[in-house]
Amino acid sequence: MSAVLKQRIRYKPYLDKIRTAAQCVDLFGAKPNQYIGWSGFTGVGAPKVVPDAVSKHVEENNLQGHENWRYNLFVGASAGMEIESRWANNNMIARRSPHQVGKPIAAAINEGRTDFFDKHLSMWAQDLTYGFYTRDKKENSLDIAVIEATAITEDGHLIPGPAVGASPEIVHMADKIIIELNTKTPSFEGLHDINMPVLPPFRQPYQITDVSQKMGTPYIPLDPSKVVAIVESEFADVVGANSPADEGSKAIAANLIELFQQEVKAGRLPENLLPLQSGIGNIANAVVEGLADASFKDLNVWTEVLQDSFLDFFESGNLNFATATSIRLTEDGFKRFFDNWDEFSKKLLLRSQVVSNNPEIIRRLGVIAMNTPVEVDIYAHANSTCVNGSKMLHGLGGSGDFLRNAKLSIMHTPSARPSKTDPLGISCIVPFATHIDQTEHDLDIVVTEQGLADLRGLSPKERSREMINKCAHPSYRDQLLAYVEQAEFECAKSRSLHEPHVLKNAFKMHTNLAENGTMRLDKW
């Protein structure tokens, strides 16, 4: 037992439950169809050594695909990519939900080896506590929860690390709990505000009217009798370096900042805007970087995930406070974060995903939501999950939680992406989205590097022109306009002009991409 481990465990009865990861392996092969819950969100705060030990056992004993070693795996969002990828490669994941990242798990899903379902993240953790996902179990519970912590309180409760996610709900639903105490990571104590699940009809309103407001506990409460093992982990989270913002992302950010300036001038937003939500990726980083350099002051953030760019945002003096459920930082970002702990910790709070993504709070605060889709169609239906309607990427995540309930709902995307044979082979503005996650009723603004389509109050026919003229790539504008004109001509005959489509051509750009490597058509 290391001195750091002993120091971090302030509940002394747990000292008798210290085990190695290898000593926990037998719990996982006890019976088929086990339900397993992990901590973690967007690749940080997930368990590492126990899942790795289970993988090693499966590999050494040629147990890949054995029914006792295939699991229903639930994580608040994506877990550590390396760990989950190893499970996927060993055919250990029978069912997965609600969000994942990594080529092996995506391959398992799209090849039919793993059943996957996604869900709005605020609803997923809630539905877990309703027993919706364990209906075939007599106990209606999770068999094992493996939760990363950075400290344990005097009463045996958990201090999470850089992610809260669905850990409170997973702990609540678990029969057995394994705590991975990460001594490589400094303690995050004081950075959390945790609310445990309360089921209807006893649920009360979330008394949050400001991003910095607390209403929970600084730890995850649990029943110490459920804890079967404490395992030391000495491995830091691994997050890849962020790609620098390209010119397209910077142009999108500039278009958004111009919109905010216009909304302030028109009196529809206050001078310090309203709480901001931003996803992850190059465009999201460019937006945050642009806001850090812009003239807006005293900004607040209510979001899911904070990336390295938010550290610059804090240091610019323009950001007052941020709430999230995960801090997804690179190695350099975490070092910078802990080197400036006294400053950053005063301006940051980590909550569960049920709270960070809660529609009640998002609507009350008037959040400005910004997310990136796979594609958006001319009537502003957005696809966030399934390429060509069939191939799952990662899952819905929290985009729907925010976009349905925000005061200002924004989707930003490049106007076009390269295919294998054409540098502009994929238009992100299409006649009809091949899968719809966000409907036309959810979006206010669509932004590309070409411009910004303000869709508020527009009819579908008006939206189609706005989308094509403002957001589509020039290589596709005439083609898309020709589709709209053809659709309006045909639908006029049948008196169905509200949202005109030519069904035989609605997906022709997608089929042409599959057959010819580009969405650019010779003719409709």
From Swiss-Prot:
Q: List this protein's GO terms for biological process.
A: acetate metabolic process
A molecular-function term among this protein's GO annotations: acetyl-CoA hydrolase activity
Enzyme's top EC category: hydrolase
Would I find RNA-binding among this entry's keywords?
Answer: no
**Enzyme Commission number(s):** 3.1.2.1
Any matching Pfam family: AcetylCoA_hydro
Q: Where in the cell is it found?
A: Cytoplasm
Cellular component per GO, a single term: mitochondrion
Which keywords has UniProt assigned to this entry? Cytoplasm, Hydrolase
Catalysed reaction(s) here are: acetyl-CoA + H2O = acetate + CoA + H(+)
Q: Which Gene3D superfamilies match?
A: 4-hydroxybutyrate coenzyme like domains, Acetyl-CoA hydrolase/transferase C-terminal domain, Glutaconate Coenzyme A-transferase
| Catalytic residues identified in the record | E304 (5-glutamyl coenzyme a thioester intermediate)
Q: Which residues bind CoA?
A: G279, I280, G281, N282, I283, G398
Kindly report the protein's main subcellular placement as a broad class.
cytoplasm
| Biological role | Presumably involved in regulating the intracellular acetyl-CoA pool for fatty acid and cholesterol synthesis and fatty acid oxidation.
Q: Which PANTHER family would you find in this protein's record?
A: ACETYL-COA HYDROLASE
The text of the family note is: Belongs to the acetyl-CoA hydrolase/transferase family.
* Protein name per Swiss-Prot or TrEMBL: Acetyl-CoA hydrolase
Q: Which gene encodes it?
A: ACH1
